[in-house]
Swiss-Prot record:
The lineage of its organism: Bacteria, Pseudomonadati, Pseudomonadota, Gammaproteobacteria, Enterobacterales. Substrate binds at residues 14, 16, 170, 279. GO terms for biological process: adenosine catabolic process; DNA damage response; hypoxanthine biosynthetic process; hypoxanthine salvage; inosine biosynthetic process; purine nucleotide interconversion; purine nucleotide salvage; purine ribonucleoside monophosphate biosynthetic process. CDD domains: ADA (cd01320). Zn(2+) binds at residues 12, 14, 197, 278. The record marks 221 as: Important for catalytic activity. GO terms for cellular component: cytosol. The gene is add. It comes from Escherichia coli (strain K12). Its cofactor is Zn(2+). The keyword Cell membrane does not apply. It holds the Pfam family A_deaminase. Inhibited by reagents such as p-chloromercuribenzoate, and by coformycin, a structural analog of inosine. This is Adenosine deaminase.
């Protein structure tokens, strides 16, 4: 189902949601951190989704073990490097990794700015080693409030040339986008792109707000757009992309089953929507699974899957020249 003549991308992928269970085990031992299990086999049910979670917040608790073992900046550097290694192993040509340095720093009170620097270093070294092209998206974790998001923003701005875009993630219902207008004004002043998690836990009004008030060029998940025909028309007309994450939306109980997922309808409506993983380490999936198992189960035809693959590159936060070069590089292989 993957067209090997086209670039394969993953533009909604959380770096801090893709920490290998084996790495959690090893870092736990290295830093004497108490884990819920002492073997890989018994640890996996604690750090990966085995059955669908009742809601998004329950799903997010699975991520916590991954960041609890980040006891040093070297550990942060390691997981960033391994994210690129994983991307290469799964055949990705281009990946946008998003991360919340405040979340990664929290368990061991690491310096937030230091986490940003460590992630940049690890990703840079991974790209050199494995030949994958990557860009970084800074996440503000709204769940921790405006002040914590401000701290994350300042850390990103200290490395503004290595950050491509700003995102807002976390508790969408408890912390609406309206609380973060000034943060996104500064992001646009820095020349960054904007993508926002919206329409996952909250309704279509959250997506409208992300676009109109925060300046979103892309929407993370965006499943609730299906409830608003005018919004779907607007997304198609303005070419505002939806970063679809099929398996994730089932595991968080955002969508009941793959057959009911709105991605097929979005594509039929002319919306620029792509296929992505979200938190592959926690979900126990990879991009190949999303294309070859999840997308057909969601009712997508072979041509629709190919269109979603094309959309992934078109939506990417790359210049027209960078996109052309990537297309030519893949076609030449």
């Amino acid at each position: 189902m993957i067209d090997t003549t086209l670039p394969l991308t993953d533009i909604h992928r959380h770096l801090d949601g893709n920490i290998r269970p084996q790495t959690i085990l090893e870092l736990g031992r290295q830093y004497n951190i108490s884990l819920p299990a002492q073997s890989l086999e018994t640890l996996i049910p604690h750090v990966q989704v085995i059955a669908n979670e009742p809601d998004l917040v329950s799903f997010l608790t699975k991520l916590d073990w991954g960041v609890k073992v980040l006891a040093s900046l070297d550990a942060c550097r390691r997981v960033a490097f391994e994210n690129i290694e994983d991307a290469a192993r799964h055949g990705l040509h281009y990946v946008e990794l998003r991360f919340s340095p405040g979340y990664m720093a929290m368990a061991h009170q690491l310096p937030v700015a230091g986490v940003v620097e460590a992630v940049i270093d690890g990703v840079r070294e991974g790209c050199r080693t494995f030949g994958v092209q990557a860009k970084l998206i800074g996440i503000m974790s709204r769940t921790f409030g405006e002040a914590a998001c401000q701290q994350e923003l300042e850390a990103f701005l200290a490395h503004r040339d290595q950050i491509t875009a700003l995102d807002l993630a976390g508790d969408e219902l408890g912390f609406p986008g309206s609380l973060f207008l000034s943060h996104f004004n500064r992001a646009r002043d820095a020349g960054w792109h904007i993508t926002v998690h919206a329409g996952e836990a909250a309704g279509p009004e959250s997506i409208w707000q992300a676009i109109r008030e925060l300046g979103a060029e892309r929407i993370g998940h965006g499943v609730k757009a299906i409830e608003d025909r005018a919004l779907m028309d607007f997304l198609a007309e303005q070419q505002i992309g939806i970063e679809s994450c099929l398996t994730s939306n089932i595991q968080t109980s955002t969508v009941a089953e793959l057959a009911a997922h709105p991605l097929k309808t979005f594509l039929e409506h002319g919306i620029r929507a792509s296929i992505n993983t979200d938190d592959p380490g926690v979900q126990g999936v990879d991009i190949i699974h999303e294309y070859t198992v999840a997308a057909p189960a969601a009712g997508l035809s072979r041509e629709q899957i190919r269109q979603a693959q094309i959309n992934g590159l078109e939506m990417a936060f790359l210049s027209a020249e960078e996109k052309r070069a990537l297309r030519e590089k893949v076609a030449a292989k």
